[in-house]
Amino acid sequence: MKKYLLSIVVFIFLLPAYVSAGEYVLVKGEETEMCEAYKKNVNSFNLHNEYVMACERKLNPQFTDFHKPQWQQLDLWRNRDFLRMVERFLGLEYDFGDPDKNPQEWEKILKDRITGMNATTINSSQVDINNDGAKENVIKYNHGSCPGGNYYGAALLVLNDDRSEIDIQKTKPLLQNPRTLKSGPLSEGWDGTMYDIFIYKKKVYFDRWRYGDLSADGKTIIKTYNLLKVFLTEPNKRGDSITKEICRYKFRSAK
């Protein structure tokens, strides 16, 4: 996976809070109640720059129609075989050594990865992610601590019933990646993209925060101002899950 450089993001993120606040402007979904409510929620925080909501889209407790899933963090040392499976799916199987050729080296690196400042984490929850009335086993994989690390990404994946494998069909709708490579795995292009889940009036949504897109050669960041998007997956009349972009926001800096 090509690394997504966020050093500048980290610097700007840590600017003092007294910098004039900006706001997220709704550019798609103005007629949707949830989109308007979500805009009010994110703008209720001190947005001294567009990166405040990068790591996690916070919820203001005053907006009682919103809430988050109950996430539980996994012990990645005890579940290191599971971690290998997840990272293989995400195209990261050789980023931290080769677990097949040299498992001892891979485990040594893993100990540093899960205890250091830039720790990799996996959180799990049961969420009705496709709004069909049945809860799925959903995990959120965090590539590194945010905003402390140079590289970051957060992906959402759905597991099968016994949590032994990734359910590819149910995971596909969650991979709303701006850059999907035809020659790569299904999940290629999620790096630098921060996914999250929220619930509004008992309906489950997922959103995507993106700093920018990579150029064709993968070396240059092309900034985009459509940073935050919200998606909804629901079954159609035939029972097929359909995913739609419901809201789109761009950040407007204070003048």
Give the positions of each predicted feature.
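Sec-dependent N-terminal signal peptides
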Residues: 4-15
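Repeat-based blade/solenoid architectures
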Residues: 114-122, 175-192
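Short glycine/acidic-enriched loop and turn motifs that connect beta-strands
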Residues: 144-147, 211-213
